[in-house]
């Protein structure tokens, strides 16, 4: 997207002008720094908050039912009763109280018997991905990932000069046969594969879930080839109907690093997540985390712990699941009403996203400008793959938007998509 294609904030314009001006300090950047880039999600953030636009772009949780009064009371109580501790340095692993709470949350997901001594509190699960890349990957190493996968993880791995190799999915998630084939191909080429990064439950961006019968098979394949599994599960507790699907980590404590987050089940603003790390890997993982942040925010840790202890968070999550189920249903119905017959889309059973596929030959990145003109924002599919090739796919987020806005956003987007499909068919 160029500055001519949309209005830029003054801050963004200044940054672009600064980037255009050559400076002698440019020569000081490391090779790694040249691999750092802003995600497509952040690219459209300033645009998506413009008045009048319906944003189906950002995967933000709904906070409308969060009891802000209780959050305020909890924060006040933490400051009044434990202020000196809350405003001071803490341990690099995170507080024991929060790590114990995290183990209770993971037990609800199906990870039983996890020890707080194996948990590292991180600055969101994004930080856990960064630590994993730092600890395990050398430049040129390979990380396997679902195709498509989370754009933030792609940016993290690429910043460490890691080669991300996509593995295909179908409606039941990562395909084990394709995983085996990709591993064999890369090993035959002499590549070193360190990690499989996977979002098995309600994948971002596709909303697809790895079938229960495939989960152990995927871990077994990785174990056979000495590949660690990095399981990112921020949406695991947000299955619309029924209990969460058992994480890969549950039966594989030595082969899976499990990443969780409070961003989707409580608040992204507290910037707290965690990694459950195999015992034999824990020390180096923890030290790498400590080297960057020294310690997670004591105030935020104590706020989250105290809030969850004084609040029925299980009931709150049940209500949240109902909210997301309603919003997902609104989006699916609107897509059926306003999108052309040539378009297909996923039908998620949880999470935040629907993944739309248009006919081959349609490039959804140029469509973004037309969608903005029509009053709606989405994320083009090319953002979710390491390839720079055009993509006929796009991600729509229903999580942070009320049903009536979802319907209006899809209604606005429908003619844009229909025109692109018709032009492609000529």
What does each model-found stretch correspond to?
Residues 97, 284-287, 318-330, 408, ...:
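A non-catalytic, amphipathic alpha-helix used as a structural packing/dimerization or gating element
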Residues 282, 286, 356-395, 403, ...:
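Conserved C-terminal alpha-helix-loop-beta "cap" of PLP-dependent enzymes
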Residues 2-14, 373, 387-426:
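PLP-dependent enzyme catalytic core of the Aspartate aminotransferase-like
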Residues 18-21, 32-124, 131, 309-310, ...:
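N-terminal small-domain helix-loop-helix segment of the aminotransferase-like
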Residues 305, 322-332, 343-357, 367:
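Conserved glycine-rich beta-strand-loop-beta hairpin in the small C-terminal domain of fold type I
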Residues 80, 84-225, 230, 236-257, ...:
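Conserved core of the PLP fold type I
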Residues 254-322:
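Conserved core segment of the aminotransferase class I/II
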């Amino acid at each position: 997207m160029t500055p001519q294609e949309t209005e830029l904030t003054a801050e963004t314009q200044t940054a672009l002008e600064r980037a255009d001006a050559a400076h002698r300090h440019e020569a000081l950047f490391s090779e790694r720094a040249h691999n750092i880039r802003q995600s497509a999600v952040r690219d459209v953030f300033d645009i998506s908050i413009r008045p009048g636009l319906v944003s189906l772009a950002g995967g933000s949780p709904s906070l409308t039912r969060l009891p802000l009064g209780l959050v305020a009371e909890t924060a006040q109580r933490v400051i009044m009763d434990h202020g000196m501790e809350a405003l001071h340095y803490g341990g690099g692993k995170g507080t024991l109280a929060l790590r114990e709470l995290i183990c209770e949350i993971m037990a609800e997901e199906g990870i039983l018997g996890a020890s707080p001594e194996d948990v590292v509190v991180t600055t969101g699960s994004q930080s856990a991905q960064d630590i994993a890349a730092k600890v395990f990957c050398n430049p040129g190493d390979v990380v396997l990932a679902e195709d498509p996968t989370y754009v933030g993880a792609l940016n993290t791995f690429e910043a460490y000069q890691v080669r991300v190799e996509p593995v295909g999915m179908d409606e039941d998630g990562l395909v084990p046969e394709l995983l085996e084939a990709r591993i064999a191909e890369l090993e035959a080429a002499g590549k070193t594969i360190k990690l499989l990064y996977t979002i098995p439950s309600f994948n971002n961006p596709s909303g697809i879930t790895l079938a229960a019968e495939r989960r152990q098979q995927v871990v077994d394949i990785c174990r056979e080839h000495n590949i660690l599994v990095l399981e990112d599960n921020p949406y695991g507790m947000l299955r619309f109907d029924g209990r969460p699907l058992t994480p890969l980590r549950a039966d594989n404590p030595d082969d899976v690093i499990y990443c969780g987050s409070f961003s989707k089940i409580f608040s992204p603003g507290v910037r707290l997540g965690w990694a459950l790390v195999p015992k034999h890997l824990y020390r180096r993982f923890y030290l790498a985390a400590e080297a960057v942040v020294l310690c997670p925010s004591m105030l935020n840790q104590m706020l989250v712990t105290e809030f969850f202890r004084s609040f029925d968070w299980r009931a709150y999550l049940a209500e949240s699941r109902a909210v997301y189920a309603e919003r997902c249903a609104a989006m699916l119905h609107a897509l059926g009403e306003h999108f052309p017959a040539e378009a297909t889309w996923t039908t998620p059973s949880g999470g935040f996203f629907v993944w739309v596929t248009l006919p081959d030959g349609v490039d959804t990145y140029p469509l973004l400008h037309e969608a903005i003109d029509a009053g709606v924002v989405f994320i083009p599919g090319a953002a979710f793959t390491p390839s720079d090739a055009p993509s006929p796919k796009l991600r729509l987020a229903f999580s942070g938007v009320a049903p009536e806005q979802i319907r209006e956003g899809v209604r606005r987007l429908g003619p844009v998509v229909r025109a692109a499909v018709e032009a492609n068919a000529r």
